[in-house]
Amino acid sequence: MNILNTYEKLEELGRVRLSKNFFMRDFLYSEIAAWHGIRNIPENPERAIHTGRMLCENLLEPLQSTFGRIHIRSGYRSPQVNEYGNHHNLNCASNEKNFGRHIWDYPDAQGRCGAMACIVVPWLVDYMEKGGSWTALAWWIHDHLPYSSLHFFSKLGAFNIGWHEQPERRIDSFAAPKGCLTQRGMSNHGGSHADQYKGFPAFLSAPTAEPSQSVYVASPVKFAPVSELSAPTTKPAASPSPIGVSFPLAVAPQVRASN
């Protein structure tokens, strides 16, 4: 496994192309990491690349093809970043709940892979400002994309969208109407819901891209058994940095322009 132990390796990881329009670097920025001085870097980069690629190719690309540019609010979280956020009430679930979700490079308790991102779809923001509901896009995704879970929030129509090798197919929301919109076993789970999203753009399939040639990607990708993965490191985070202080480039690589 290629451990990220130099800045040059971090740059190489950021250049890995996950899909036609997304690169690994798009998902590494974290406000928690930047403000509190915590490294948001995968401990198992090959696994993070694989699950991130599945998320992008199966979910994010078709969304962007159909509705236009999407905005990534939160993507990958290292175990350290996620644990800090959970312990300090920064809207992060526990590490155990986020393995196979925001923590892309560690599988869930059943050893299954997954990846999640929190996104904003500007098209949905405009739609809701005109009186539409987030539920319309939720049903559109349910009918068209192989998502595992969706969780909508009250601001900007933002939502978590997750890919998983064993999809749950469940939609929840903190925004009104709150609660579970659908899950397996509910009477509204099957069939078409086209009447819920009348007037939506026609579905456009996702574009494809050639796989990135990177030292972090084996061909074919082979993962170490779950039993051989080292336990996530969760070192105490540094104290908050005051506004105006520059953060180290290794913490927030997005600040540095590179080719």
Model region roles, listed by residue range:
Residues G14-R17, I32, N89, H142-L145, ...:
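Generic secondary-structure transition motif, activating predominantly at the C-termini of alpha-helices
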Residues M1-E12, S65-G68, A252-Q254:
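Internal hydrophobic scaffold segments of catalytic domains
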Residues S19-R25, E43-A48, M54-E57, N188, ...:
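Proteins with a high burden of low-complexity, intrinsically disordered sequence enriched in S/T/G/P/A and R
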Residues N2-N44:
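N-terminal, Lys/Arg- and Ser/Thr-rich interaction peptides
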Residues R15-V16, K20-F22, L28, R69, ...:
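Short linear sequence motifs
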Residues Y29-H142:
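Cell-envelope/glycan interface and biosynthesis
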Residues I103-N259:
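Catalytic cores and adjacent binding grooves of peptidoglycan-active enzymes
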